[in-house]
Structures are given as C-alpha cells and as structure tokens.
Amino acid sequence: MINIRPDEISSIIREQIEQYDQDVKVDNIGTVLQVGDGIARVYGLDQVMSGELLEFEDKTIGIALNLENDNVGVVLMGNGRQILEGSTVKTTGQIAQIPTGEAFLGRVVNPLGAPIDGKGDIANTETRLLEAMAPGIISRKSVCEPLQTGITSIDAMIPIGRGQRELIIGDRQTGKTAIAVDTIINQKTEDVVCVYVGVGQKASTVAQVVNVLEEKEAMAYTIIVCASANDPATLQYIAPYAGAALAEYFMYNGKATLVIYDDLTKQAMAYRQMSLLLRRPPGREAYPGDVFYLHSRLLERAAKLSDALGGGSMTALPVIETQASDVSAYIPTNVISITDGQIFLSNDLFNSGIRPAINVGISVSRVGSAAQTKAMKQVAGKLKLELAQFAELEAFSQFASDLDEATQKQLARGTRLREVLKQPQNSPLSVAEQVALIYTGINGFLDELEVASVKKYCASLLSFLNTSNNSYIGIVSSTNQFTAEAETALKEAISESKAVFMK
C-alpha cells in the first residue's frame, strides 16, 4: 500500500493557494446591430471611450466616433465584409496610435504604420498617438530659420520658414505636387526629415512620387504615408494625423521636419462621407460642423519648438485642390485662415507656359520673410517691386498702342524676369544660384538678350559659376550674405559667361 504523506499534500495545496491569482479580466463586449458602407452600429458598449479602438470578431479594427443613447457608431478600418449582424465587438482600451522611429525612413507605410512597399517589417521603437496635442504657446519659438524649397519664385517672394504652415492651392493639374516634391528633393543637404502624405490619390501617382524621390536619392530621409483612393474613408481621414505623428517623433528629438499633406480636400471629403453615414447633421456644402476643427487641430501641430524642448521644427505644406480657381469655397477659405500664407497656382499661367505657375500677386507668406537669408533679402525686395510694376504695365499696355521708351524698357525687363523665374521640374536651385539669377535679371544684364535665349543663358551662367574657379558660390554659401566681394565676383562671371554665350 502506498504511503500517504499528509504534510507533503498540505504543502502542495498551500503552494497552489499562494499562487492563485484572483485578477479578473473584464471585457466590455457589444453586439453589431447593422453594418455597411464602412460604418457599424454596435449595441451594448457601455464603457467605451470616444475615439477608442474596437476589435470585431474577424479582427477588423474600428474607431468609436458616435456615442449615442442606445448604440455606438463605429467607423471601420477594413472592408468589414466578414462582419455579420449579431457578431460580437470588444473594446481594446486603446486610443488610435501609430508606431514611430528612425526605421521608418525610406519606407512607404499605410496610415496604421504597416509597410506597403514589400521591403519587410519595420522595427519600431515607440508609438505615438495619432491625435496628439499641439505644442502650447510657451513650447514654441517664433519662426527664425528658412526652409529652402529650391524654387526661385518661392524662396525670393513667398519665403517659407521652419515651423511655418504654407498652403499650396490651385486647380487640378497645375503643378501642386511638383512643388511639394521639389521641396523634398531640395532638403538633401539640409538635414530635414520629410514626410509625404498621399490622401485619396491614385496608387500610380504615389508610385510615381516614390520613383522620382528614389531617382534623386531623396528617399533616404523621407517617409511616405499612403491612403489611396481605394482605401476605406477611415484610413483617408486618419492619414494626415499619421503623417504628423511620424514627423513629431523627429521634431521632439530636435530635428527639422517637413510634412506635405497631398491633399486635404480629399481628407475633408472622406470625413464628410463618414459623418453623413453616421447621420451627423450636415452644414455648408454638406460638410459636418466640425470640419474646420478637422484641419485646425492637424495644422496647429506644425511648430518651431523652443530651445528648452530641443529646438526641433515641423513645417507643414498642406495642398488644397480648387474647382475652377474658386478660392472662396468652404474648405479653401478654412485652410487659408488656418495657415501662415498660401502659394496660389494659376491655370492660365500654367497653360501659357509659365511653370511653376505661381500667381505672385495673390500668394503671400505671413511669417517667412523673418526667416529669409540676408543674401536673398538683398535682391528679392527689388524683384517684387519690378514684377508688381511689370504686371500693372502689362495690363495697361494691352490698351495703349504708343508707349514711351522707359515703359518699353520696363516691359522688356519684366518679360525677361518672368523667364528667369521659370524652372523645370525636379531641378531645385541653391540659394547662391537663385541670388545670381535674380541679380542678373533685376540689374539689366539680360536686357540685350532675346527673350527666347534668356533661359539658355541662365543655364550657362549657372554651369559657369559651378565649374569655374569663380569665388561667388563659395562666398554666398559660407556667409549667407551677398557681400561686395560676392557682387564683384558675380559681375565678372556674368561678363565672362555672356562673352562666351554671345559668340
């Protein structure tokens, strides 16, 4: 017979009792009442938070947006085809967040931070809330450093500073994305992390942007967030916030960042679709009442941080598409009032061959001039004046037949200045090169050239400055000032290159 040892049994029982864990896990579970059009109505989630992530039986994730008396309105982040009426939903206790980190550089991700470029998983170090609070007044510093776009007409007349929000607005096919991509390419030597957010774009358009950035070796410091036209409205709605969260990680680590939202019109449309399906009351143009807050809370996250917080910055370039150049529509006026200035692209200028098609007359930068480099300030003031007078005279000269010599000279110079400001796509210029071209134009060095050969001469002048042992580029690049020494060197370069060009 086996010996039973009571002391051993009692010690085992005591050990089991000591290890007994009395923690009770309570899941808040609800039932799907109806589902369709990317929206689910759920009954029974009494403890749910506004904006909380919910998990359905088929692992689809949704966001609780409408908390009503008897049900919860949930927007789905997937197609929801496997969700059935009566299936269960449980709360996750989490608010929407996205993984962030250095490993995201050079990658294409969806608004949830999952890679969609086929290059494997991304090792993330931390997560950030999609809807983070914008920095307060004490956390900020006034805009004081320039962000060079490499586009002469912008850097000279509508300068952008680090931490600024500058709207790019225009009709479809007027070169809005081209300006944004050029700006990214120009940050190659500037140590700026760029985030391009494609909202509601064709996947082929985003692929084209990726190809251009790879060709120009700009993907190394760029993250692309893509919610294409065939993605659910929920993903299109959160994509800009995801881009801002990715940029914030670098901003709070003391880096300069640039975020491009291309474009916020499509985000507003996605939000309108969600709101109408959730039966929220429509307002002007059927947009919900809080569509202003949709964009203001996003764009307020762009800032130049104080030195105490590391001095990082986030510059935002939101893009808005207008219909028939109607800037007074609801979304354009909203975003114009939120941002620190706008670059207006005109269809007529684009079609008449002036590219980038920037309408300088109605484009403004409200804070960027404080951050403009001294070299550019020295030549840009006169350029603005010349172009403003030229625009006025050009309109007048269409009616007047006999013009005096001074007026004809001014018109001729204005036409040549306009040629100087034309620039091919994906070929941004350095500050020194821009200053050289503007100086050449405003001081009459191009007056004796034919209008048709101005662009050709500008190209030859730049190649001369970059290849000869002329000291101009070195002086301006190192001092950021257009000194008397630099002016002398530039005048020499102009006369030498012109002599070769005129042969």
Swiss-Prot record:
Coarse class of the protein's main subcellular location: plastid
GO cellular component, one term: chloroplast thylakoid membrane
Site (Required for activity): S363
EC number: 7.1.2.2
Alphabetized Gene3D superfamilies for the sequence: 2.40.30.20, ATP synthase alpha/beta chain, C-terminal domain (1.20.150.20), P-loop containing nucleotide triphosphate hydrolases (3.40.50.300)
UniProt cross-references to Pfam families, sorted A to Z: ATP-synt_ab, ATP-synt_ab_C, ATP-synt_ab_N
Xref: PROSITE patterns: ATPASE_ALPHA_BETA (PS00152)
CDD domains in the cross-refs: ATP-synt_F1_alpha_C (cd18113), ATP-synt_F1_alpha_N (cd18116), F1-ATPase_alpha_CD (cd01132)
Subcellular compartments: Plastid, Chloroplast thylakoid membrane
Signal peptide: none
Reaction catalyzed: ATP + H2O + 4 H(+)(in) = ADP + phosphate + 5 H(+)(out)
GO molecular function: ADP binding; ATP binding; proton-transporting ATP synthase activity, rotational mechanism
Family as reported in the entry's similarity comment: Belongs to the ATPase alpha/beta chains family.
Subunit structure: F-type ATPases have 2 components, CF(1) - the catalytic core - and CF(0) - the membrane proton channel. CF(1) has five subunits: alpha(3), beta(3), gamma(1), delta(1), epsilon(1). CF(0) has four main subunits: a, b, b' and c.
UniProt xrefs under PANTHER family: ATP SYNTHASE SUBUNIT ALPHA, MITOCHONDRIAL
Role of this protein: Produces ATP from ADP in the presence of a proton gradient across the membrane. The alpha chain is a regulatory subunit.
This protein's name: ATP synthase subunit alpha, chloroplastic
Taxonomic lineage from the root: Eukaryota, Sar, Stramenopiles, Ochrophyta, Bacillariophyta
